[in-house]
């Protein structure tokens, strides 16, 4: 029995959490573990404490039970897909109140902030890592759907360099549990509503190509994007469209979340964008990273972010 299952076995009240602005991997891993525990362990009080994810993940069993509030009575905290305490947001306080804590993560920038830490940065996703810690014979269809979703999203539908033979084998084993895997990919990764598609077109129309075509960036202020969509999560995927432009090595997408506050997303083909994100106070992976920055957008770009990108491109 590995450390995760040992801690679950010995706990009564369990809180499962993940990073702020939960994506497919964070949502999938937290709900996968929730389903696995509730289906295989008796007498456990389990709560998923997480910012409400995008409604496109409503199909995952347990989605409607997610609570944004900390679970103060938890004697075990399981953190999934978060690289440091700050990424847990207000739910980070549970690290102080829970008797035991364990972090399961695949980010190279992980700070080993929990009492116990299982971090494997070579994994495509936290869902892939979590799969290796669970008993396959006890993985239900509900759990498999969650795990598969996370792997699909963090591997870029199996096209990022973090995808390995084992990633594909695990995905295949999950598909064997029996669910419509093509619908998951289509509905949660590719499909966008009309206004979100129009917003994507606006970003691409106004995007800038610099540094001999090796960097492409797009910007949105708060009033612009809120004029098209009601949820920032509907901008997921814009950064990938910038990265997919021929010749681009590093893509940048920055949008305003509040006055003088901006979310920065970075993607690359070969360059290490995690170092750039870390310098900006964020984190992530070598090929996919992000941060939240404060200041005027044009000043941040000209004085800080673009010089960092140029330096990384020049080696």
Language-model features: locations:
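Solvent-exposed alpha-helices and their adjacent loops that cap or buttress functional pockets
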Residues: 69-71, 93-96, 110-111, 139-141, ...
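Generic enzyme active-site microenvironment
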Residues: 17, 21, 79, 103-104, ...
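Active-site cofactor/cluster-binding pocket
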Residues: 59-116
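Hydrophobic helix-and-loop "lid/oligomerization" segment in the mid-to-C-terminal part
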Residues: 2-18, 28-58, 68, 73-76, ...
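Glycine-rich, phosphate-binding/catalytic loops in enzymes
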Residues: 33-34, 94-97, 119-120, 169
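Short glycine/serine/threonine-rich phosphate/pyrophosphate-binding segments
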Residues: 24-30, 85-89
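Short alpha-helices
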Residues: 104-170
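Short glycine-rich anion-binding loops that position phosphate/pyrophosphate groups of nucleotides
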Residues: 20-22, 82-85, 107-109, 222-223, ...
């Amino acid at each position: 029995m590995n450390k995760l299952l040992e801690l679950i076995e010995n706990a009564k009240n369990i809180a499962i959490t993940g990073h702020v602005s939960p994506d497919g991997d964070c949502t999938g891993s937290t709900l996968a573990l929730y389903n696995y525990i509730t289906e295989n362990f008796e007498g456990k009080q389990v709560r998923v404490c997480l910012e409400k994810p995008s409604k496109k993940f409503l199909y995952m069993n347990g989605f409607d039970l997610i609570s944004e509030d900390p679970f103060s009575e938890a004697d075990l905290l399981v953190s999934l897909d978060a690289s440091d305490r700050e990424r847990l947001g207000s739910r980070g306080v549970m690290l102080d109140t829970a008797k035991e804590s364990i972090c399961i993560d695949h980010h190279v920038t992980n700070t080993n902030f929990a009492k116990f830490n299982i971090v494997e940065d070579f994994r495509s996703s936290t869902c892939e890592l979590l799969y290796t810690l669970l008993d396959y014979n006890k993985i239900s269809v509900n759990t498999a759907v969650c795990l598969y979703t996370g792997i699909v999203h963090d591997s870029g539908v199996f096209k990022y360099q973090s995808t390995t033979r084992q990633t594909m084998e695990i995905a295949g084993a999950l598909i064997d549990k029996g669910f419509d895997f093509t619908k998951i990919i289509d509905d949660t990764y590719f499909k966008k509503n009309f206004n979100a598609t129009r917003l994507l077109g606006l970003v691409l129309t106004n995007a800038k190509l610099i540094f001999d075509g090796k960097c492409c960036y797009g910007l949105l202020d708060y009033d612009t994007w809120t004029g098209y969509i009601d949820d920032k999560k509907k901008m997921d995927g814009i950064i990938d469209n910038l990265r997919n432009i021929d010749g681009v090595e590093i893509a940048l997408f920055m949008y305003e979340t509040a006055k003088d506050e901006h979310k920065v997303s970075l993607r690359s083909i070969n360059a290490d964008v995690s170092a750039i994100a870390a310098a900006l106070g964020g984190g992530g992976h070598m090929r996919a990273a992000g941060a939240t920055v404060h200041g005027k957008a044009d000043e941040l770009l000209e004085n800080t972010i673009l010089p960092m990108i140029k330096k990384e491109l020049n080696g």
